[in-house]
A protein has these predicted regions:
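Beta-propeller blade termini and top-face loops
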Residues: 1-214
Length: 214
């Protein structure tokens, strides 16, 4: 049994005319049914493209191209859950360094042959997005199920951005409270929360108006 988040026709395609025409660039990728693919081009060396490939028959893995996608070579069997993660980010300075978003972030320093976890002490897990400062590759912003975190030392210490009230909502409902109805939402990893639709003060809604439902 294999879960694959794709189907016939899945693969990588390349355009050199701004999207007017496309060609497949799948030489070296698995010849079986392919699912979700995370891909990034190395700013340090644009000839290099990395791809993390979900595929049937346990043939997925981490792939590397050194000729702008014309051919691919499997570096390792590293994959994540294609239905929730599978995003990668190449370091803008070091062409051999790539970060994988997953429950816990991981990093390769040898072009995908081996990986180790990035330090995430006092940080929420389930990572999905990353920005690496092109002028200082120790400075990152990472988006995860718990919000946005910043580090200036490659993950040794993290700063949570408390002024950005972001989370993932799955379901929203309202009640019949008066004078203002409450809004409730079920979130990913962060309970079900509720709060008023309006308040009787000139400052408007603030974080203290929200509560965890029981």
């Amino acid at each position: 049994y294999t879960y694959v988040g794709g189907g016939p026709g899945s693969g990588l395609h390349k355009s050199t005319d701004g999207g007017k025409t496309w060609k497949e660039i799948n030489k070296g990728l698995p010849g079986v049914e392919i699912g979700r693919i995370g891909m990034d081009i190395s700013d340090a060396n644009p000839e290099i493209i990395y791809a993390i490939v979900e595929a049937a028959e346990r043939k997925g893995g981490f792939y590397k191209s050194t000729n702008r996608g014309e051919t691919w070579v499997k570096q390792s069997g590293k994959v994540t859950s294609g239905n929730y993660y599978q995003e990668i980010f190449a370091d803008p300075v070091d062409e051999d360094v790539v970060y994988i978003m997953d429950t816990w972030m991981s990093v390769t320093h040898d072009g995908g042959k081996s990986f180790k976890n990035v330090g995430e002490d006092y940080k929420h897990v389930d990572n999905h997005a990353m920005w690496i400062n092109p002028n200082n590759n120790s400075h990152w912003l990472v988006g995860c199920d718990g919000g946005i975190y910043e580090t200036f030392d490659k993950g040794k210490k993290w700063d949570f951005k408390k002024n950005l009230p972001v989370t993932q909502f799955y379901k929203v409902a309202v009640d019949n409270a008066e004078p203002f109805y409450n809004i409730y939402g079920g979130t990913q990893d962060n309970f079900s929360i509720g709060g008023p639709s309006r308040v009787n003060n000139s400052h408007g809604l603030s974080n203290q108006d929200w509560f965890i439902t029981h």
